[in-house]
């Protein structure tokens, strides 16, 4: 598991009162067996702090590994990339929802992928480019390992950042939404 160090960045210019927004720990998972990824962000006051960005491995003994990955932080919100109905990874979504159901007040939300349109390869390329842009903003670019397969990490990070920006009603040009605003769906 590779992890980036934490850093914080203020993303909005208009102040928000504590009544409007308190500290929140957001976790986003890009689901998969061999290449799942997790991003954990802390949103407090007017800033976002990257707590963790990790590549995970759920290829064997996945129940224990997912439980361990879920137990590392006290999440307020867990975002899961929506999977097609017959995907073999749907079991991960149901396991995570079940694991968190009675143990915490964590909201578990299934969301559509951030990048849409064009080809699969183009979407992954745009996701990695947006991820690198954010790493520059957070001052973490040097912490990103040099590797070819960064799209899973990028996807999990972009899921989390889109959620934060949408809560703050802030636009970011890299995140092209579908025509409908129904990309968040509770399962």
Swiss-Prot record:
It comes from the Viruses. Binds 1 Mg(2+) ion per subunit. Keywords: DNA damage, DNA recombination, DNA repair, Hydrolase, Lipoprotein, Magnesium, Nuclease, Palmitate, Phosphoprotein. Plays a role in DNA replication by cleaving viral DNA concatamers to yield unit-length viral genomes. The concatamer junctions contain inverted repeat sequences that can be extruded as cruciforms, yielding Holliday junctions that A22 protein cleaves. Its cofactor is Mg(2+). The gene is OPG149. Its EC number is 3.1.-.-. This is Resolvase OPG149. It comes from Variola virus (isolate Human/India/Ind3/1967) (VARV). Belongs to the RuvC family. Poxviruses-type subfamily. Transmembrane segments: none annotated. GO terms for molecular function: four-way junction DNA binding; magnesium ion binding; nuclease activity. InterPro entries: HJ-resolvase_A22 (IPR006932), RNaseH-like_sf (IPR012337). One of its GO terms (biological process) is DNA repair.
């Amino acid at each position: 598991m590779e992890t980036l160090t934490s850093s914080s960045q203020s993303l909005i210019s208009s102040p928000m009162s504590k009544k409007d927004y308190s500290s929140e720990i957001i976790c986003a998972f890009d689901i998969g067996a061999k290449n799942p990824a997790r991003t954990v962000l802390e949103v407090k006051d007017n800033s976002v702090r990257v707590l963790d960005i990790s590549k995970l491995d759920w290829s064997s003994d996945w129940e224990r590994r997912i439980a361990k990955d879920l137990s590392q932080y006290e999440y307020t919100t867990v975002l899961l990339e929506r999977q097609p109905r017959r995907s073999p990874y749907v079991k991960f979504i149901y396991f995570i929802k079940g694991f968190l159901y009675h143990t915490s007040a964590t909201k578990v939300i299934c969301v559509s992928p951030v990048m849409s349109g064009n080809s699969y390869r183009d979407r992954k390329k745009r996701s990695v480019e947006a991820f690198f842009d954010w790493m520059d903003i957070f001052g973490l670019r040097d912490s990103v390992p040099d590797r070819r397969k960064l799209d899973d990490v990028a996807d999990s990070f972009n899921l989390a950042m889109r959620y934060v920006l949408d809560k703050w009603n802030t636009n970011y040009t890299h995140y092209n939404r579908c025509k409908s605003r129904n990309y968040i769906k509770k399962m």
